[in-house]
Amino acid sequence: MTNELLYEGKAKRLFKTDEAGVLRVAYKDDATALNGVRKESFAGKGELNNQITSLIFSYLAKEGISSHFIRAISETEQLVKEVSIIPLEVVVRNVMAGSLAKRLGKEEGEEIPNAIVEFYYKDDALDDPFINDDHVLYLDIATTNEMDTIRQAARSINKVLQELFNQMNITLIDFKLEFGRDAAGNILLADEISPDTCRLWDKETNQKLDKDVFRRNIGNLTDVYTEVLNRLKQVQN
C-alpha cells in the first residue's frame, strides 16, 4: 500500500493506493476550533471518528444514499472512492444553535419546522463565508442542476439521520456535509459524518455530545464521542 500523501487537513490525511480511483483516509487525533486557530490532540479521537463515520455511511448506503465510502480497513483508516471535492460546506439545521442563533437573534434550542439548508464557501483564508446559489454560480463552484442535486441529497440525508439519531435518544441539531464529483461527474456524499461535523444533544438532558464540548470547554471530548459510538452500535446491532 502506497504512503504517498495527497492532502492533509485539520482532521484527516488522504493517501494514494495501488488501486486506481481508490484513496485511503487516515483519521487524526487532532481537534480544531475557530477555523484551526485553536488546536489540541485527543488520544483515540481518530479511531472514534473513523468508526462512527464508517457505521453512518454504511447505514446511509442501505437507505439508498451513495457516498465515497468503500470500507474501513483499520481502526483509524478507511478506503474511499476518489472524488473531486466541491468547495462547499452544506449545513443542514433542524434546531437553532451556534452561528445561526446569533445571526438571527434567536434562542438556542428553538425547533426549526422545516430544516434550513445553508451553503458556505470552503476557503480558510476567507473564513468560509456564507453564500447563496447566485454566489455559487458566479464562482463557478457548481451548476444549477448540481445545486438542486446537492440540496435534495442534503434533505434526504437529514431525514435518514434524524430517524437514526432518534433511535439513539439524540437530537440532530445541525450538521455539515461535503460532496464531490466522481470520474463520471456524479455527485457523491464525501468527507465524514461524526461528532466533529454534527451538533448532537441528548434528548433527555440536552447534554452536548459533539465537538462543542471542546469549543466551549464544557466536557471531555473522547468521553462524549465514545458515548455516541456506543449508542450507534446499540441501534445497529
UniProtKB/Swiss-Prot annotation:
Q: Which SUPFAM superfamilies match?
A: SAICAR synthase-like
Q: What GO annotations for molecular function exist for this entry?
A: ATP binding; phosphoribosylaminoimidazolesuccinocarboxamide synthase activity
Q: List the catalysed reactions.
A: 5-amino-1-(5-phospho-D-ribosyl)imidazole-4-carboxylate + L-aspartate + ATP = (2S)-2-[5-amino-1-(5-phospho-beta-D-ribosyl)imidazole-4-carboxamido]succinate + ADP + phosphate + 2 H(+)
* Biological or metabolic pathway of the protein: Purine metabolism; IMP biosynthesis via de novo pathway; 5-amino-1-(5-phospho-D-ribosyl)imidazole-4-carboxamide from 5-amino-1-(5-phospho-D-ribosyl)imidazole-4-carboxylate: step 1/2
Domain of life according to the entry: Bacteria
Q: Which family does it belong to?
A: Belongs to the SAICAR synthetase family.
Gene Ontology terms describing biological process: 'de novo' IMP biosynthetic process; cobalamin biosynthetic process
Q: What is the lineage of its organism?
A: Bacteria, Bacillati, Bacillota, Bacilli, Bacillales
Q: Which UniProt keywords apply?
A: ATP-binding, Ligase, Nucleotide-binding, Purine biosynthesis
Q: Which InterPro entries match?
A: SAICAR_synt/ADE2_N, SAICAR_synt_PurC, SAICAR_synth, SAICAR_synthetase, SAICAR_synthetase_CS
Question: Could you tell me the EC number(s) of this protein?
Answer: 6.3.2.6
Species this protein is from: Listeria innocua serovar 6a (strain ATCC BAA-680 / CLIP 11262)
Name of the protein this chain belongs to: Phosphoribosylaminoimidazole-succinocarboxamide synthase
